[in-house]
């Protein structure tokens, strides 16, 4: 058996070495379904890891496929791990996935992300009109949040010229500390509701409505973003806050074994209630009619067949 460290997997290994690593982790031989697969998720404290852990537990209960949850910077990093065979599954924002629809397939659309912009309550930012010149963390390096945030800031005219903001890319724990210590004035996060890490902050925060960017986003990225809302109860606001929504896809490599793809579909549908984090307020897509909507990424053929077998 080949021994492969997590560090070598995340730094990237050659195709042949990565293939050997996958076999070693799975404890299988060529042509057989792996008994263990890796899923590239996101940062600790975020929704991606929560979902990955719930999916892992559901697969364990089903006795089909073991799942290793791999923490990463987010969607863009996850695509790289999938591309280089350092993960068999990845959860990825639809806008990040659509930048290159090749060499990947979808198992399903699983839930909606909300692009959230947190500022200190009573701080220097009360709305978008206060953004010019401010220090803003747009998300972790190689995260989907950073990709979406850059698109939003571009649409709002806040990345260039006299109104440009000062952009940094901070990991979640760094961003939270920076917000509390006034090192940044706002932080972006893309995830489900609520963001668990916010609930442990000593500093009171509030959300900024970013939805005035939607018309320009629709022109540049048609059909990718939707108008959503963060309920008032989420972070203690007196009213709901409008937000920008974007779907999440559970992606795989095209050579993911058919029986693994089928097992994943069975769990996504049969264990849907157990795949929603406790206290989650966001929109879930864990029904057959919603799971199959993964455009422009094609469904894994075996997953598509399984959806048809179950629901026609």
Give residue ranges: language-model regions.
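N-terminal export signals
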Residues: 2, 8-27
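Bacterial signal peptide processing site
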Residues: 29-31
């Amino acid at each position: 058996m080949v021994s492969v460290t997590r560090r070598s997997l995340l730094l990237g290994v050659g195709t042949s070495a990565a293939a050997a690593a996958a076999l070693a982790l799975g404890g299988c031989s060529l042509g057989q379904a792996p008994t263990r697969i890796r899923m590239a998720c996101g940062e600790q404290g975020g929704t991606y890891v929560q979902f990955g852990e719930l999916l892992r537990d559901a697969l364990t209960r089903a006795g089909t496929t073991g799942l290793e949850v791999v923490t990463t910077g987010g969607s863009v990093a996850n695509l790289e791990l999938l591309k280089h065979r350092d993960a068999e599954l990845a959860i990825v924002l639809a806008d990040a996935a659509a930048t290159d629809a090749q060499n990947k397939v979808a198992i399903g659309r699983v839930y909606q992300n909300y692009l959230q912009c947190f500022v200190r309550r009573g701080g220097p930012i009360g709305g978008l009109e206060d953004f010019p010149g401010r220090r803003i963390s747009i998300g972790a390096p190689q995260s989907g949040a950073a990709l979406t945030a850059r698109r939003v800031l571009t649409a709002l005219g806040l990345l260039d010229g006299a109104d440009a903001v000062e952009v940094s890319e901070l990991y979640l724990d760094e961003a939270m500390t920076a917000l509390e210590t006034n090192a940044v004035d706002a932080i972006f996060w893309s995830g489900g509701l609520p963001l668990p890490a916010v609930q442990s902050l000593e500093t009171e925060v509030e959300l900024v409505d970013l939805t005035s960017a939607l018309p320009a986003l629709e022109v540049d990225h048609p059909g990718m973003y939707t108008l959503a809302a963060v309920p008032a109860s989420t972070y203690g606001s007196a009213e709901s806050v409008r937000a920008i929504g974007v779907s999440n896809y559970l992606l795989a490599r095209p050579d993911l074994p058919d029986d693994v793809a089928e097992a994943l579909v069975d769990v996504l549908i049969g264990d849907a209630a157990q795949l929603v984090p406790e206290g989650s307020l966001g929109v879930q897509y864990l029904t057959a009619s919603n799971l199959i909507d993964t455009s422009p990424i094609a469904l894994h053929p075996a997953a598509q067949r399984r959806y048809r077998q179950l629901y026609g």
